[in-house]
Amino acid sequence: MKLLFKQRLFSWFDSYDIYDENENTVYVVKGQFAWGHCLKIFDASGWEVGTVKQKVLTLLPKFEICEGDRCIGYISKDLSLFKPKYNIDFNGWHVKGDFLEWDYTITDAYGRSVASVSKEIFHLTDTYMLDIQDPADALYVLMFVLAIDAEKCSRN
């Protein structure tokens, strides 16, 4: 399954659509004013399906990933000197790659690819693609990608 989003994606108090490869809206993301970043994810029918919330009283950036009312995992930035590194606390997932260039991979505990994230260059505006192996993981992958970008945006 592939999910696509356009350049204007990460605007904190705006809403934007996440598309499938046929440009059908799959999710809608809405930024919410809160202490720290907070994004609510809705399915195409308008039902809230997930939330990405920044934990504010932490030394390094950390985000809570929730499905409905239940916290299912965390992603945090690790201390590193040159390249950003992140730690995912969910199903044994790991993330590695070049986060600054939007080219990274999420793998499971056995090293198998869960998803890859890349920047598409053949579009009029910057378009980002999530290539997700199992459609059942689409919401989870999207929420972790949103958290990584939230951390990147807060540095700029």
Protein language model annotation of sequence segments:
Residues 1-156:
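Intrinsically disordered, low-complexity proline/glycine-rich segments
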